[in-house]
């Protein structure tokens, strides 16, 4: 996920660097001055309320302000537009043949034609600069103006309120002197529409890839969780089956196992007195603490690879541990049985034919263990029977 975000950021940066363009524009400081006839006082105003046109020279200019004579031609779109410059001698209209020779600035309204036409018409009448005031609905806003090919004529735009402020004394035939100077430089960066579409497509693509990756991730996680739950269920069944295996505690002096020679095949340590061992169906013996974790993970005997769980498939009932006392008649056997674990099912099936001591069953199990003595595994007995075994051996001689 982090790699995709880094790739997207790099892509956006590359797109921004290659497709972004910067727009440079300058504000105009507009200063006006006129004399109020009624009070004979000077009224001045200076605000950074103008904006230079894109193709206008960024220069300062000054002069008296003129405006279109015809109220229906305030936009200055007609080539024959006549301008009045208050304060001129004989109130002459500005034009090519006018006696007015000082620089003057045309004040026209926005709309009716292109900015370029307005500038051309005013320049043909001798204006050294053109001030265009915005529409009333735009309030105090100004916009960029494109007017290629207008030469050295300075062009600025002011807001509608500022235009009306300048127009008010002109309509009373009061000369207004204006000074335009360069204001603050502004740089505005923007991205083209094509770049925006490209970045949007790239972003959507990244989101789709990320969503697909998340869906894949959570599906895998769900499957893994389900498998874990299944494994836990199997582990519970395995533990339940392992609990049915016989347990025996090693006793000192037992002949079925040589404590000094025999060892657990899992931990490779010799059996010690009082060690608790588990007897598998294949008659192999291991430490309980060693073989139980092994069976939970592998289910097979470490030595003969017998599947212990399958071998215990017939042992479906919980185990019941019974103490079986070995009679003296079989005490001389090389292997003897101390405590043996049998299931409730076997106990019930043979309970009606055997006495409470279960002597016949113990004899059968003893013979079975003797047949497997060559595998060095045994069910061990109490050391108290050692003397009886020795006596039996002497009598046989």
Curated annotation (Swiss-Prot):
Glycan attachment points: 40, 140, 231
EC numbers: 2.3.2.27
Molecular functions (GO terms): transferase activity; zinc ion binding
InterPro entries cross-referenced by the UniProt entry: PA_dom_sf, PA_domain, RNF149_RING-H2, Znf_RING, Znf_RING/FYVE/PHD
Chain intervals for the UniProt region annotation (Disordered): 39-60, 341-397
Localisation: Membrane
Pfam family for this entry, one: PA
Top-rank lineage group of the source organism: Eukaryota
Entry GO CC: membrane
Catalytic function, reaction form: S-ubiquitinyl-[E2 ubiquitin-conjugating enzyme]-L-cysteine + [acceptor protein]-L-lysine = [E2 ubiquitin-conjugating enzyme]-L-cysteine + N(6)-ubiquitinyl-[acceptor protein]-L-lysine
Designated name of the protein: E3 ubiquitin-protein ligase RNF149
This protein's encoding gene: rnf149
């Amino acid at each position: 996920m982090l790699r995709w975000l880094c790739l997207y950021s790099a892509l956006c940066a590359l797109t921004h660097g290659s497709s972004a363009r910067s727009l440079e524009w300058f504000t105009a400081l507009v200063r006006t001055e006129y004399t109020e006839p009624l009070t004979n006082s000077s009224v001045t105003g200076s605000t950074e309320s103008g904006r230079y046109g894109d193709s206008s020279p960024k220069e300062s200019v000054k002069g008296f302000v003129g405006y279109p004579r015809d109220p229906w031609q305030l936009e200055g779109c007609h080539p024959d537009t006549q301008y009045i410059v208050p304060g001129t001698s004989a109130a002459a209209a500005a034009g090519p043949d006018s006696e007015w020779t000082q620089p003057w600035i045309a004040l026209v309204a926005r709309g009716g034609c292109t900015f370029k036409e307005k500038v051309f018409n005013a320049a043909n009448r001798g204006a050294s600069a053109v001030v265009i005031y915005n529409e009333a609905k735009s309030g105090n806003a100004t916009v960029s103006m494109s007017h290629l090919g207008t030469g050295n004529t300075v062009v600025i735009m002011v807001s509608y309120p500022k235009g009306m402020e300048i127009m008010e004394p002109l309509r009373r035939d009061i000369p207004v002197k204006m000074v335009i100077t360069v204001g603050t430089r502004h740089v505005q960066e923007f991205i083209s529409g094509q770049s925006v579409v490209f970045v949007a497509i790239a972003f959507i693509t990244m989101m789709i890839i990320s969503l697909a990756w998340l869906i894949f991730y959570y599906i895998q996680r769900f499957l893994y969780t389900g498998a874990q739950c299944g494994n836990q269920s199997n582990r519970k069944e395995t533990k339940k089956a392992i609990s049915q295996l016989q347990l025996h505690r090693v006793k000192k002096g037992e002949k079925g196992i040589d404590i000094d020679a025999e060892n657990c095949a899992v931990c490779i340590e010799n059996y010690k007195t009082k060690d608790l061992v588990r007897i598998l169906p294949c008659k192999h013996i291991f430490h309980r603490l060693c073989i139980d974790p092994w069976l939970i993970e592998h289910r097979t005997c470490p030595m003969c690879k017998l599947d212990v769980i399958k071998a215990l498939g017939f042992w479906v009932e919980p185990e019941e541990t019974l103490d079986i006392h070995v009679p003296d008649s079989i005490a001389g056997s090389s292997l003897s049985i101390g405590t043996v674990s049998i299931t409730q099912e076997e106990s019930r099936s043979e309970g009606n034919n055997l006495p409470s001591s279960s002597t016949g069953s113990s004899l059968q199990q003893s013979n079975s263990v003797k047949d497997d003595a060559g595998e060095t595994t045994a069910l061990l007995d109490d050391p108290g029977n050692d003397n009886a075994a020795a006596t039996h051996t002497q009598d046989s001689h």
